[in-house]
Regions:
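Hydrophobic hinge/microswitch elements
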Residues: 22-27, 31-35, 40, 103-155
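Central regulatory/effector-binding core of bacterial HTH transcription factors
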Residues: 1-47
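Residues at or immediately flanking beta-strands
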Residues: 13-18, 116-118, 167-169
Length: 197
């Protein structure tokens, strides 16, 4: 949102179209010239694509904010084996978040294939609402769940032994002449996140 607000302030006559999808589809759309720029949580293809890391984010396990999970947060202290007994809602296959979650769970000693995955959902807002309503727990980025955590709608548990986070990348086709709007958008991302060339 910060980037979109700044872009709109600087270029009020420009209109941008936003499509929410997983990292695999973002890269496909970039390669096939269906989109000029995109954002991914994982680096997938480097032959055609240029990735600019602009933000460090970490994944967290989110749960409903109930007495059971508040107690678990106090007692578990870094042990997430309880996750194996939960209904889990994941991002869809192809999602950078899902790929990164699998990697971090393995590092924490959890085999992702042992999870009781009851749903795979594309939209993060739908996942967060489903968790709030008690359908299950999920693994999403801390940034994506910040407002819900702050408001007390969900609880966030860190994943132990995770690294220092994952890069969120701006991606574009390096073999394709970008539109003026796309170049201006990339410039705004660089300004907002203070990225050197």
């Amino acid at each position: 949102p910060k980037v979109l607000i700044r872009f709109n302030e600087k270029y009020p006559n420009e209109q941008i179209k936003i499509i929410e999808t997983d990292s695999t589809k973002v890269v496909t759309q970039i390669i096939e010239h269906m989109a000029d720029v995109g954002f991914t949580g994982t680096v997938l293809e480097k032959k055609h694509c240029k990735y600019i890391p602009f933000y460090k984010d970490e994944l967290v396990i989110i749960t409903p904010n109930t007495e059971r999970y508040r107690k678990l947060r106090e007692e578990a202290a870094g042990d997430i084996r309880w996750l194996l007994k939960e209904h889990v809602i994941m991002r869809e296959e192809g999602s950078g978040t899902r790929k990164e979650a699998r990697k971090q769970l393995k590092r924490a000693g959890i085999n992702p294939s042992d999870l009781d995955i009851i749903a795979s959902i594309e939209n993060q807002e739908t996942i967060k609402k489903s968790v709030r309503q008690g359908m299950g727990v999920s693994i999403l980025s801390r940034l994506a769940t910040k407002d819900e955590t702050r408001a007390g709608h969900v609880l966030a548990f860190p994943i132990p032994k995770s690294d220092d986070g994952r890069d969120i990348n701006l991606v574009y086709n390096k073999n394709y002449q970008l539109s003026g709007s796309a170049e201006r958008f990339i410039k705004v991302v660089r300004e907002v996140y203070q990225i050197k060339r």
